[in-house]
Amino acid sequence: IHLQLMLRRLKESGEDDKLGKSLETCIKEVERLDGIIAHFLEAIRPSEPDFRETNLLDLLEETLRGREEELKARKVSAQVEAGAKDPVVFADPEQLKQVFFNVIGNAIDAMDKDPKLRVITSGDDENVYVQFVDSGVGIAKEDVPKVFEPYYTTKKGGHGIGMMIVYRIMRDHGGDVGIDSKPGAGTIVTLRFPRKDRRMRLLEEAKT
């Protein structure tokens, strides 16, 4: 907050553009560190899901809007293909936003030349599926199981807990996550969510 106040006052005064850029860099670094700390806290002290009716398509679009500047900066073409009819599940929307945020972030980091990200929703009577299809470097078959292990990462500066959090949240929601990938052919991350009525049945059965 103090850095942001200093930057605003500096801009208002019209003084020292070089110092202003340094302050902007400091603010971005503090925000990055805040994100890392938040991830670690979520990993070691997970919160209980606050279940409610949640439209996955609305949540996906909201998450993509939140990463719009990053997508533009990295020149990523992101497309949502809505194939699921009534993609409403019984879930914690804030936790699912974290899932989408982490998966999309991994896809962005994995892509370089002509980056394309497709987000596809589909469904059947029991489940709703969300697939993230990227045009990135891919993952070797022997490394795929390691993705969900704590602190495993191939990214420079990565902390290796993002997909572990994804796995835990999906498990807590009665769903699961799968990865299909190979080097040079991109990666497909598939999230499976039980439909609203099925999730409520599972909760009732767990109480009896």
Region roles according to the model:
Residues 52-64, 123:
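A conserved beta-strand-to-alpha-helix junction within the catalytic ATP-binding
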Residues 52, 72, 77-87:
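Conserved catalytic submotifs in the C-terminal HATPase_c
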